[in-house]
Amino acid sequence: MINFLLLVLILSVLESQENVHTDELPKCMFGNNVCAKLQKNFQGTYLQQLCICEDEVCVKMLKNTNRTIAEPLCSRQTCSTSWRSDSHSKSATQGDNQYQFCSDIRNEFTKTCTVNQNAYKEATITTIATNKKEILHHYYCYCPPEFKYVYSTTNRVVNDTHKVESKFFKCEAIPSCNGDEVCKIAVERTNSYTVSKHCLCYNDKICPDDPKEAFSNKTQNDGSTYYEFKCPDLTICIE
């Protein structure tokens, strides 16, 4: 039950802006902000947009060789809504998930997360006067394919104008499944179907993610349905 609740928390955090329209999304404020997340699963490729890239970013560059005149060098930033190659400098691939960025994150992408390092942060920024909330996702280091994000801690900061609640996640190796342990949990909502991997099946067997192969399902009050899956030789199919 505890593992199920933890997986639900992770799924909820990484889908926190699923129903937010593009024109309501915050602007990406930092180079390591994730502007979109894509996931490949049974239903195809699911896109979750998280923040809007600035149309144009300008950096002052020195002109000519005398290095006395500075002029802006501007480049247009866009957030990809389609799957990129694993080597693309504006995306980070983690197994069936890919994180998109407005600008080059090559330095972060090449740094593999250490055991105790915070790998990912979700920051909820609330404007006190209006109670308006904005959520930004920060990427700190590369989490390899057979690893997962595990909730670590929450930090809260309040000043005269804003409240910021930051949830941190570590990068942890996905363990091998024990016995009839649940290997994946999927959540289905009106416009989305997303999957979280819990453990790896033995003998290179693939944990399913088709709802028809689910071991069990739970429908929540908000209409969403959570499916639990087990490794193929232990799965009991339900209608």
Curated annotation (Swiss-Prot):
Gene3D superfamilies: 2.20.20.160. Contains 9 disulfide bonds. Disulfide bonds: none annotated. It comes from the Eukaryota. GO terms for cellular component: extracellular region. One of its GO terms (molecular function) is toxin activity. The keyword Signal applies. This is U-scoloptoxin(11)-Sm3a. It comes from Scolopendra morsitans (Tanzanian blue ringleg centipede). The lineage of its organism: Eukaryota, Metazoa, Ecdysozoa, Arthropoda, Myriapoda.
